Amino acid sequence: MSYVGLHVHTHYSLFDGVATPEEYIDRAVELGMPALAITDHGTLSGHRELYRIAKAKSVKPILGLEGYMCADISDKRDKSEREGQQDLVYNHIILLAKNQKGLENLNKISEIAWTDGFFRKPRFDFAILEKYKEGIIVTSACPSSVLVKALEEQEFALAKKHLKWFKDTFGSDYYIEVMPHNAPEINKYLIELADEFEIKVVVTPDCHHVDTSQKEVQEFKLLLNTHAKVQKDITYAKSAKHSSMMDRLDYLYGKDRDITFNKFDIHLLSYDEIKGAMEKQGIDREDIYSNTLLLADTVEDYDIKDGLDLLPVQYKNPDQELANLTLASLEEKKLNSNWLGNDIYEQRLDEELSIIRDKKFAPYFLVVQNMINWAKKEDILVGPGRGSSAGSLVCYLLGITDIDPLEHGLLFFRFINPERNDFPDIDTDIQDTRRDEVKDYLVRQYRHVASIATFLQFKDKGVVRDVARVLDIPLTDVNK
């Protein structure tokens, strides 16, 4: 027997997840899971990576989100100002894309959450969820959900009100989650309500790391993120220095600290592990496992576009357009006395255009050139060139950079290597006070435009300093 992990946080859940999508997929293969969901907090950033890896390893990807739900996204008051409405501030809820339409709606919900709904966290409300419900599967989520919060306060009428809304809105695509780390009485209430409302129950591990080997790293990241304070007047006894890492953290921050993962098994549990944990709570129902498989079976494949497929099509033959522009520019620059020799430039241009043509990158160069030409025409300051793109003669001839790569001995292969399968990255410095004008132009010109986030990883020296801070080791000792 197996089940499917439907509540999974990767390292894209910043400071709240440790494992990579690949580590989770490898674990799913090891456990015999036919499918696996990704439900990072407030972000869809891990979707493409998990999808690609899951498909390569014959695991069905289920793309989702653990979102933050509120009563009204226009209400941006602090909790202290809400007078008893605190249960409707940042409520967790799991959304899973059932099909391509569901994935499109999931993206739309996320977009609204990060723009109109953002208040410390990306939020959406009941009205938005109802508007974009098509193709969405909803599960009730963790102890921070509206449902569990109501049960914890013994507000049973409120819990039933929420359940009725979700069932009326999503029908059979709404599921109630039970978890091994829920309080036993909460799981009991959830199952009773599910039976009363004829809603299917699924068991979920609410994973934040892939296995127990990552538990210490998870706790370190949590302490960093919550800016935990060492207990006052504590002295670091010699005996504590030789204890386990988790014991040392308990010693420094207290076993009963408000936020900790140390008390829970929140890794991707095997079927036997999760079944054993639920049986300890007196829950022995096979349907909570089989329902995860049934849910996964309802999920259809998605049409995930590759990077090149997303580029706008404005030319019937972008390769020819790029060749025409660069050759015309080369002819114009032949009058410059600094040229090393026309044959050298023509040979280099042929080589670059050939690689760009083989890689199908021409539309990207044309888009960047169009953007920079417009900015310069509007007297917006643009940098002369930065990064590896300065090694491209094509970029120079298009006016993307102002640096002659041959004159300075710069290599094109640092920019685009034909043996690598990555996408070129043209770094462009634009006058910061007028950058929004350029973005607005791109939207007008190409319609479908998105900002891109960059995820930075902990580096060696930074990791040492952060670990030392968590372990209350003076930086003077670290710097020795």
Predicted segments, located by residue:
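Non-catalytic structural connector segments
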Residues: M1-V4, L147-V148, A194-E196, G276-R386
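Class I SAM-dependent methyltransferase SAM-binding "motif I" and its flanking Rossmann-like core
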Residues: C395-D422
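Conserved phosphate/anionic-ligand binding catalytic regions in large, soluble enzymes, centered on
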Residues: G102, A141, V202-V210, I380-D402, ...
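Extended substrate/RNA-proximal surfaces in nucleic-acid metabolism proteins
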Residues: S2-A35, H41-F197, K215-L224, Q231, ...
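Conserved short loop/turn motifs at secondary-structure junctions
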Residues: I38-L44, E177-P184, H209, L310-Y315, ...
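A structural-propensity feature for long, helix-poor, extended segments
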Residues: I274, M278, F415-S451
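Active-site or pore-adjacent capping/gating segments
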Residues: V217-A323
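A residue-level signal for conserved active-site and pocket-lining positions in enzyme catalytic cores
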Residues: D40, P61, N99, V138, ...
